[in-house]
Design a protein with these regions (language model features):
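Carbohydrate-associated surface elements
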Residues: 205, 236
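Conserved nucleotide-sugar donor-binding subdomain of glycosyltransferases
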Residues: 66-122, 168-191
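Active-site proximal beta-strand in glycosyltransferases
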Residues: 116-118, 135-173, 200-201, 226, ...
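N-terminal subdomain of nucleotide-sugar transferases
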Residues: 1-63, 203
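Membrane-proximal helix-turn-helix segments that form the acceptor-binding/catalytic region
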Residues: 140-141, 145, 169-199, 206, ...
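Conserved small/polar residues in nucleotide/adenosyl-binding loops
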Residues: 253-256
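Acidic anion/phosphate-binding donor-loop and adjacent secondary structure
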Residues: 228, 237-248
Length: 256
């Protein structure tokens, strides 16, 4: 199951890290619509509960190994039982606030304190926010840095401030124009940009583009403020997938 270029990056990037130097792990929602063939490979690790303001929600953690990489899956049928990963924005803003909190609270449970958490797009935009505002005083999280990657500036995860505040329990002062507020709404992408330690995007030219009024989707001023922390990195090619020696869609296989 994949819905775009983000899936290609998350699926391919981790396996190319040097396993002797880096302990790379991936954590994803356990969507009901994931491939049924994968389910028998998942092993239950644990369960716990997270608070979303006044809500208390179940979190189940499953794990599996693929291409030498450890994957974790966050289970919650209230949020992830749909027929597709993304629904309407009203449901998604609560779903991904839950996911961001569940990821952070899973770390001490699975006894893994990463040096860096790599977040992708607005769906994980609140993770750097939660890390610095809610968990910043907890010694377990001290020293954990975040990298926030923007794949498409157009999709920002915007919704009513009152309802986002109700879901997240974030303090009122965060919903200002210098942090999460954006034209009267709360903006998850903006939160990630403001709170992440470093920001990357899919190419050097796109990094330049999102700093302009034409490409910044209203956030160009903020991107200019954070330009020193912004890097454009071209997506690589997964040679296990795009291999001219094995590609059945070309007339002749060949070695390059």
């Amino acid at each position: 199951m994949k819905t775009g270029g983000l899936a290609d990056v998350v699926g391919s990037l981790p396996k190319y890290f040097d396993k002797d130097r880096y302990d790379v792990r991936v954590i994803l929602p356990k969507y009901k619509c994931m491939d049924d063939k994968l389910l028998p490979q998942l092993k239950f690790v644990c369960h716990f509960y997270v608070n979303l303001n006044w809500r208390r929600q179940y979190v189940g953690i499953f794990t599996s190994q693929y291409d030498g990489v450890t994957y974790y899956f966050v289970d919650n049928e209230f949020y992830f039982a749909g027929d597709k990963p993304y629904n309407n924005i009203y449901e998604d803003v609560e779903k991904f606030a839950f996911f961001s909190k569940a990821v952070l609270e899973a770390l001490p449970v699975i006894d893994f304190a990463p040096d860096v958490i790599h977040c992708n797009d607005w769906q994980t935009g609140l993770l750097p926010v939660f890390l610095k505002t809610v968990y910043g005083s907890d010694n377990f999280y001290a020293g954990i840095k975040t990298v926030f990657t923007i794949h498409n500036m157009k999709f920002q995860g915007r919704w009513k401030i009152k309802e986002v505040a109700d879901v997240t329990g974030l303090p009122e002062h965060i919903f200002n124009s210098g942090e999460l507020e954006f034209y009267g709404e709360a903006n998850y992408l903006k939160g990630g940009i403001v709170y992440a330690d470093e920001i990357t995007t899919v190419s050097p030219t796109y990094a330049d583009e999102i700093c302009t009024p034409e490409g910044g989707e209203g956030l160009d001023g903020l991107m200019l403020e954070r330009r020193r922390h912004l890097r454009g990195i071209v997506n690589g090619i997964d040679y296990d997938v795009f291999n001219p020696m094995k590609d059945t869609s070309v007339s002749y296989t060949h070695l390059t």
